[in-house]
């Protein structure tokens, strides 16, 4: 049988969340995903996932748009290739479509999974080999009222989590910082704490806010100003008493080059979807390491498919500030046969071929949007 690629399909599914997850501009009660399946003539199927954190507010791509882009443009571009690998497929997609990193990442992920299954190797092994069997998880807390969020933080602390991320930006900076400070008081001094306004502050507010966050015991501030304003980020980094973590300011390889040259951040949050795929996220990591910028494994609130892809990449990094792959634990259900495993606040990196997880076709049919 031929190993040539025969089809690429994209299916939208909607999964409810275990509790509302408040972000800077929206509150999630469910998560929508695009499941990609790349089928080859020899019977192998590679799987990928397109996912945005709560809709198009973050990067501009919607779940519906991701599916339309894959069906109408990206899949036809890849299927024209004789034997598409992740790299050659990305080049083909770039020729036909500008931007759209989340859609491209979903297709590329499926091809990495297919390549790993054919070789009998995990994606981490294909990338050079894993450095870590487990990854430390920073638990993502919702941007909701302090008492409710504090109770959740204390519960997760008892489960073994040693890192916590405070979502911010939904209310004015003053009361928001007071809310975070009240929650922080419930946690011991030795846990990692990250505050994320999602670029909601102007530079003046951020300068005052970072000092206030430091006084409350927060160790890291993620993207306090708009992603485009790398100059302000650099100025804040030069004066801030806490570590500055770039996210929206680091969406492309070119962004990463600018950050490394300007030393605009202490750390960078890398995400497979926002980078446009595993290969480009890996390239960004290489640039960050060369520039002395620490790596933080970011999340787009993915299922076990997206979490497995990111974990495969993150496990190859020699040093990792933290990792935020909490998506599977925020979802009521998953769409793989055996979901990603978590133990004592750490994620166990799958060791099987490709992504190391297998799609549950019955659940895909059940949760598929009609």
Say what each PLM segment does:
Residues 3-8, 13-17, 28-34, 41, ...:
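Flexible C-terminal active-site loop/helix
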Residues 5, 36, 43, 74, ...:
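Conserved, mostly hydrophobic/aromatic
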Residues 9, 39-118:
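Metal- or metallocofactor-binding catalytic centers and their adjacent structured scaffolds
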Residues 24-29, 99:
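Short Gly/Pro-enriched turn/cap motifs at secondary-structure boundaries
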Residues 48, 135-141, 164-166, 193-197, ...:
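Hydrophobic faces of well-ordered beta-strands that scaffold small-molecule active sites
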Residues 106-142:
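Glycine-rich, aromatic-flanked loop segments that form ligand/cofactor-binding clefts
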Residues 128-240:
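Metal-dependent enolase-superfamily TIM-barrel catalytic cores that perform enediolate-based chemistry
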Residues 211, 217, 228-243, 250-346:
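Shared catalytic-loop signature of beta/alpha-barrel
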């Amino acid at each position: 049988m031929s190993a040539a690629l025969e089809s690429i399909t994209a299916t939208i599914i909607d999964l409810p969340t275990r509790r509302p997850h408040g972000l800077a501009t929206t509150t999630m009660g469910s998560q929508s995903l695009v499941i990609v399946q790349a089928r080859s003539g020899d019977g192998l199927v590679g799987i990928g996932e397109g996912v945005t954190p709560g809709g198009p507010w973050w990067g501009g791509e919607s779940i519906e748009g991701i599916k339309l882009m894959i069906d109408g443009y990206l899949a036809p571009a890849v299927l024209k290739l004789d034997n598409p690998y992740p790299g050659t497929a990305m080049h083909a997609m770039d020729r036909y479509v500008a931007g759209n990193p989340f859609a491209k990442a979903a297709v590329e992920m499926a091809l990495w999974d297919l390549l790993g299954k054919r070789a009998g190797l995990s994606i981490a092994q294909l990338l050079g080999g894993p450095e870590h069997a487990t990854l430390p998880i920073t638990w993502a807390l919702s941007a909701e009222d302090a008492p409710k969020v504090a109770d959740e933080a204390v519960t997760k602390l008892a489960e073994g989590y040693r890192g916590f991320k405070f979502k911010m930006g939904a209310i004015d900076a003053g009361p928001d910082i007071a809310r975070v400070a009240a929650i922080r008081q419930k946690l011991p001094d030795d846990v990692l704490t990250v505050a994320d306004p999602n670029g909601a502050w102007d530079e003046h507010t951020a300068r005052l806010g970072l000092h206030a966050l430091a006084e409350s015991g927060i160790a890291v501030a993620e993207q306090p100003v708009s992603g485009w304003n790398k100059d302000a980020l650099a100025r804040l980094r030069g004066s801030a008493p806490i570590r500055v973590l770039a996210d929206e300011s680091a969406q492309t390889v070119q962004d990463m080059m600018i950050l490394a040259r300007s030393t605009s951040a202490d750390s960078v949050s890398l995400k497979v979807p926002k980078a446009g795929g595993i290969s480009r996220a890996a390239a960004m990591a290489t640039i960050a390491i060369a520039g002395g910028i620490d790596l933080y494994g970011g999340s787009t609130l993915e299922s076990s498919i997206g979490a497995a892809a990111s974990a495969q990449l993150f496990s190859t990094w020699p040093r990792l500030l933290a990792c935020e792959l909490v998506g599977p634990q925020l979802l009521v259900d998953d769409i793989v046969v055996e979901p990603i495993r978590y133990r004592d606040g750490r994620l166990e990196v799958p060791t099987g071929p490709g992504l190391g997880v297998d799609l549950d076709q019955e659940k895909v049919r059940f949760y598929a949007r009609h």
